[in-house]
UniProtKB/Swiss-Prot annotation:
This is Dual-action ribosomal maturation protein DarP. HAMAP family: DarP. SUPFAM superfamilies: PSPTO4464-like. It comes from Yersinia pseudotuberculosis serotype O:1b (strain IP 31758). InterPro entries: DarP (IPR006839), DarP_sf (IPR023153). Keywords: Cytoplasm, Ribosome biogenesis, RNA-binding, rRNA-binding. The lineage of its organism: Bacteria, Pseudomonadati, Pseudomonadota, Gammaproteobacteria, Enterobacterales. Belongs to the DarP family. It is found in: Cytoplasm.
Length: 182
């Protein structure tokens, strides 16, 4: 058996290809993960309502496939979502993903605003007139008299165990103020 010298690779000519011509190898599992991510994106698109879909930049074929998937149930729906994932692989999904993220973010902002308004309303009812300056500081357009009367009525309703009509009116009023401010 012939033994090769340790420096036998030194005689092999180096590959002089530029880095630009280099082929990037992608593993099979990475391709599968990407395909699964696109299928999940397709599922999210199918779960959206009609109004939300109008805000997302989709071509006619993809929109038709999504609308069809919304009508189908069970196994046919799964196959249709697979098709949508395949269609997404052939498209630039970045604008679609960006629009979807904006929709989700808008929803999250709205939810956090509602929680903030609910906390403010609860504070108004618990503290009464002492909390009104805080509301006026946040919303300078607020009517002090209307706010005070709503708070008093809500406190009376709460004490008498009546339905919380003024309680809801305070929230509606605060929501109107928040919308005007935006």
């Amino acid at each position: 058996m012939n033994k090769q010298p340790e420096d036998w690779l030194d005689d092999v000519p180096e590959n002089k290809n530029d880095d630009d011509d280099e082929i990037i190898w992608v593993s099979k599992s990475e391709i599968k993960r990407d395909a699964e991510a696109l299928k999940d994106l397709g599922t999210e698109l199918v779960d959206l309502g009609k109004n939300a879909l109008e805000r997302i930049p989709l071509d006619e074929d993809l929109l038709a496939a999504i609308e069809l998937a919304q009508k189908i149930k069970k196994e046919g729906r799964r196959r249709q979502i697979q098709l949508i994932g395949k269609m997404l692989r052939a498209r630039d999904v970045e604008p679609i993903q960006t629009a979807l993220d904006k929709l989700k973010n808008r929803h999250n902002q709205q939810v956090s605003l509602f929680h903030k308004l609910e906390t403010l309303r609860d504070r108004l009812i618990a503290e009464g007139d002492d909390a009104i300056p805080t509301v006026l500081e946040l919303y300078p357009d607020a009517d002090r008299q209307q706010l005070r009367s709503l708070v008093r009525n809500a406190q009376k309703e709460q004490a008498a165990n009546k339905p919380p009509k003024s309680f809801r009116q305070i929230f509606s009023y605060l929501r109107e103020l928040a919308e005007k401010q935006q």
